[in-house]
Every structure is written in structure tokens, then in C-alpha cells.
Amino acid sequence: MNKISHGQELFLSRLRRHRLIVRFARVLILALFLILWEVCADTGIIDSFIFSSPSKIALCFREMVTDRSIFLHIGVTLYETIVSFLLVTLFSILLAVLLWCSRKLSEILEPYLVVLNSLPKSALAPLLIVWLGATPTTIIVAGMSVAIFGSIMNLYTSFTTVDREKIKLIYTLHGTRRHALFKVVLPSSVPAVISNMKVNIGLCLVGVVIGEFLAARNGLGYLIIYSSQVFKMDWLIMSIVLLCIMAMGLYAVIGVVEKIYQKRF
């Protein structure tokens, strides 16, 4: 039976206390911000029509939950984000592997990937609408366009920086490039893939919202544009808050996947 020393117990106690303080401080800052916002709106320090207030936003959310319209908008945005994220993850891994397998191809395509990654993706959205029409497919492609080029470059860089000695060992044992890929490169790059996924989930959400601004009839992005046009600031700020919560939730899911991987491997 393992026994924990006094020093270890003291360290764990301090660690738990530190985490508790951090969580309490986070909640306190948020609570103070909401209270200050509500007080300023009620006393007229800020214009409640323009800036709304937490109570108005909560009331607006309750009304949309009652008529269930908010679930449609959340579901549409969540579906498009997850699909675009999964496609980005799949295609970026496949293309990064292809570039790693062919040095000549990587040298040919590298400048194009750099240029495409540097393009402002919001400028591509109108072009995608013309090409694909105002459909959910267009929004999914818009979400992919924000993340995929940078993801390919990051994964390819990760593949090329794997320990060369391990790859040489594979070849010394008469292994092939395929063996090096599946025995060394991909297993060594799993942390980089997960790290990339954490970034991509947020980027895909941004791309989906940009697409919904221009080519949607449902979704939180559409709700933001519509509410800004009719000056319903309660709807607008509520939609932004829901997007923040969605982003945090999706990021947390990837974090859980990372912890499961770390515990198993």
C-alpha cells in the first residue's frame, strides 16, 4: 500500500488550495462584472437599449427557450461547426502525411499553402456563396477554410521534426517509409494533432459564424446579424454569450480527449 509523505501531502494541499483560489477568483470576477453591468444599466450610467443588461438577456433567453427557437439556432451552428472540424482534422492529417511522404510535392505546394493561409477568410465567404449557393454546405466549407491550411502546415512541420534517429533505426532494421510513418511519425505526433484540434475547433466556429452572417436562415451567426439589423440588442448579446459558452464547451471536450490519451499512453 502506497503511503504519501508529509511533504507530498503538503504539496497536494497547496495545489488544491491554489486551484480553489483560481476558480473562486474567476467566478468572483464574472459575478462582479455582471453586477456592475446590471447596476449601470438600471441607474442609467449606460444606455440599456444599446448595452442591454444581464436581466434582460436572461429574460430573452428564457423566452426563446420557451418557444424552443433558440435550440434550432444552437443546433445548426453546433452541427456545422462539428462537421467542419471533423473534416478539417481528417483532411489536414491526410494531406500532411502526403506532404511528408513526398518531399518534392511539399516543396511545390508550400508557397501555395502559405498564401492560402494568409488570405482573410471573410473575403472568401462571398465567393463561396457564388460558387456553392446559400446552403449549409457553403457554411461548412467556410468553417473549413479558416482552419485547414494552417492545420496542414502545423502538422507537416510536426511530422518533419520527429526524432530522425528513430526513423533511421526503422530503416536500419529494413523497415520501409510506411513503417516509419505508422511506427514513429504518427505516434510521436499525436500530441501535436490534439494541440492542433484545440486551435481548430475555435477557428471552425469562427468560420461557421462568418458563413452564417452571409448565407444562413438559422444559426447563432444569422441571429446576430438579424438582431443587429432590427436593433434587438438583447438577442445580439445573448447570441454572443452562447457562442462563448459553445466555444468553451467544445474546447473542454478536446481537453477531455487529451487527458484520456495521456492517461492511457
Language-model features: where?
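Loop-to-helix entry region at the N-terminal start of transmembrane alpha-helices
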Residues: L72-E80, S122, V130-S151, I194, ...
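Short helix-to-coil transition segments within interhelical loops
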Residues: L119, F159-E165, L169-S189, Q229
